[in-house]
């Protein structure tokens, strides 16, 4: 970049400049925030982590006769300007992502300088910057002195009017049909180029002294109504999708769709709805109603935090399933430990009192309906082999590669509770024997549940499934620590400090004993299948809860959120289905995941129509 003294306007940033905020790791400036919002609105399909959008001119990708200022948005010429050999250009920081579908930027002519030999356009990486855009291969430009367009050639073609000081020239790239058109002062000038390649950079070139231009990559509203043009093309692309020819096999197509819907309902245990749908569409149900209801009952137990009962019920309905899926068993046991800390598992529920100091702050999962997004996360492995869940909490740590049934060696740092002597080995039936002591009223009410209402929980009085008193403790995943020295008499009686197991000594001892059994199970699995880092992390996370007097407000307290039960529930449900030779994921979700992945591949291949055919647009 040229020295500040050589740059007109240097030191006078304009509103929306990208250079001011965020320097030194600070917060983004209001201008940067507004730019981000506008770009997100214009190009919602672009993943800016993978393919950043152009936001300014590149100080590293320019000829040395070019000077930059005002957040690298202002370009001025500082060469001799004797002939075409003194031409100079600059490219934007990033190429235009194909996922934009339609991309637009504007350039304001601050001064035409001596002769107004200015070019605005596009160029590929590596094109000579000692030339105006359009003169070389993979370079395209609209020049102000004669109004000609230059398409990879030194010979221009008549295109539009000339432009000079005060004019605003826009450049629109249509990545759907590979064309480009320009605008002048908000009015379209028509198609200038066709058959454009992918990965082009916004480019401007200057040639004579005094020439100054300002770029607008979205920092300010555009003169041209680009959003109206985008709406037009969105309608065209979606019309193509809607008009896809299937009339020749309409009956077959309808049957496929009906089977997909039916299998989705069955997968998630909506027994009554699946039965009614099958009756209306004459679609066969691939699973017996009794089995669906059994899975429904098990899912309900997990989502209520009664994991020990869910394990026992699974062993009763599906003998051998957990014994042949040690990873799943270990995940369930870790989740059971978390729920014992939470006070919802019947192992401690019958021991601890339901006093105001009790830790049962989460009444149940706030939503039992599956959460779906348009991305390939539909295709994630929720089975027993998946290492991505830690106690049912989606891990943010680096992914590990594991064999089908690996397991960890014991970690001495997992918890003080695991340091005590434990059996040298423990078989699965023994490790599950602790689940047999359950409250009888739970099983009696479970037998009466026969419809989809089984899968509904009463969480209306608890926003997001959390008691109101929790809102002051957990905010956006940030846990506020309280001074443990505070005199309890000064605390608000309406919000007493919660204690592990409500302060019940017997329940606390039961948790510690269960932790030892869990440690022993981990060691046995480690001997049989080898070390498993995912298991080690599960133990460390779960046992860490015991290090805090108030686990719900500690840094690892998010494990206690009922929403973290859902990955465990999904893994168990998928394993049950797989054991019955049924798909572990419903075909509908696989189709959505495949569609999302296809759109990503289209973007990487430079097919811009992917931006206007988002899966989100078809999910209501």
Swiss-Prot record:
The keyword Nucleus applies. The modification N-acetylalanine is found at residue 2. It comes from Homo sapiens (Human). The SPRY domain mediates the interaction with MET. This is Ran-binding protein 10. Residues 253-285 form the LisH domain. It is found in: Cytoplasm, Cytosol; Nucleus. The lineage of its organism: Eukaryota, Metazoa, Chordata, Craniata, Vertebrata. The modification Phosphoserine is found at residues 361, 365, 367, 369, 422, 451, 453.
């Amino acid at each position: 970049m040229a020295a500040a003294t050589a740059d007109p306007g240097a030191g006078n940033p304009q509103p929306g400049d990208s250079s001011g905020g965020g320097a030194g790791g600070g917060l983004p400036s209001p201008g940067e925030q507004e730019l981000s919002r506008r770009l997100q609105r214009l190009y919602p399909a672009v993943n800016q982590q993978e393919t950043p959008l152009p936001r300014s001119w590149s100080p590293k990708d320019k000829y040395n006769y070019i000077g930059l200022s005002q957040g690298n948005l202002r370009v001025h010429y500082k060469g001799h300007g004797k002939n075409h050999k003194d031409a100079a250009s600059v490219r934007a920081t990033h190429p235009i992502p194909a996922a934009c579908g339609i991309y637009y930027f504007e350039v304001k002519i601050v001064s035409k300088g001596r002769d107004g030999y200015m070019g605005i356009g596009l160029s590929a990486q590596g094109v000579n910057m000692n030339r105006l855009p359009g003169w070389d291969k993979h370079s395209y430009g609209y020049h102000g002195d004669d109004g000609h367009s230059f398409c990879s050639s030194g010979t221009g073609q008549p295109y539009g009017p000339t432009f000079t000081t005060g004019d605003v020239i826009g450049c629109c790239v249509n990545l759907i049909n590979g064309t480009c058109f320009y605008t002048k002062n908000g009015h379209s000038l028509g198609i200038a180029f066709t058959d454009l390649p992918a990965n082009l950079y916004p480019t401007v070139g200057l040639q004579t002294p005094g020439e100054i231009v300002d770029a607008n990559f979205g920092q300010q509203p555009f003169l041209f109504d680009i959003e109206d043009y985008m709406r037009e093309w969105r309608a065209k692309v979606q019309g193509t999708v809607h008009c896809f020819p299937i009339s020749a096999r309409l009956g077959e197509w309808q049957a496929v769709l009906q089977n997909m819907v039916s299998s989705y309902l069955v997968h998630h245990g909506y027994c009554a709805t699946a039965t009614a749908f099958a009756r209306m569409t004459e679609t066969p149900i691939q699973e017996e109603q009794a089995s669906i209801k059994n899975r429904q009952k098990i899912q309900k137990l997990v989502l209520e935090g009664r994991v020990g009962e869910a394990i026992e019920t699974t062993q009763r309905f599906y003998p051998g399933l957990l014994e042949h899926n040690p990873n799943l068993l270990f995940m369930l046991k870790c989740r059971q430990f978390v729920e014992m800390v939470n006070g919802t598992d019947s192992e401690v529920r019958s021991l601890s009192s339901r006093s105001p100091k009790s830790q049962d702050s989460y009444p149940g999962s706030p939503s039992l309906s599956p959460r779906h997004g348009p991305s390939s996360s539909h295709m994630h492995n929720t089975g027993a082999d998946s290492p991505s869940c830690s106690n049912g909490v989606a891990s943010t740590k680096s992914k590990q590669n594991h064999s089908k049934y690996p397991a960890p060696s014991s970690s001495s740092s997992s918890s003080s509770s695991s340091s005590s002597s434990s059996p040298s080995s423990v078989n699965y039936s023994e490790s599950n024997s602790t689940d047999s002591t359950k409250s009888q009223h739970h099983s009696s009410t479970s037998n009466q549940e026969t419809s989809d209402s089984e899968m509904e929980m009463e969480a209306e009085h608890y926003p997001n499934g959390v008691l109101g008193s929790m809102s002051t403790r957990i905010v956006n995943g940030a846990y506020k620590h309280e001074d443990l020295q505070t005199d309890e008499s000064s605390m608000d009686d309406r919000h007493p400090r919660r204690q592990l197991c409500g302060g019940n000594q017997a329940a606390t001892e039961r948790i510690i004993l269960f932790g030892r059994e869990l440690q022993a199970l981990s060691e046995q699995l480690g001997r049989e299948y080898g070390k498993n880092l995912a298991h080690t992390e599960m133990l460390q996370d779960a046992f860490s809860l015991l290090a805090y007097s108030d686990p719900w407000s500690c840094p690892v307290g998010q494990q206690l959120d009922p929403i973290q039960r859902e990955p465990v529930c999904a893994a168990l449900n998928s394993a049950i289905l797989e054991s019955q030779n049924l798909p572990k994921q419903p075909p509908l979700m696989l189709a959505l995941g495949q569609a999302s992945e296809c759109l990503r591949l289209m973007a990487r291949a430079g097919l811009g129509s992917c931006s206007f055919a988002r899966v989100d647009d078809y999910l209501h």
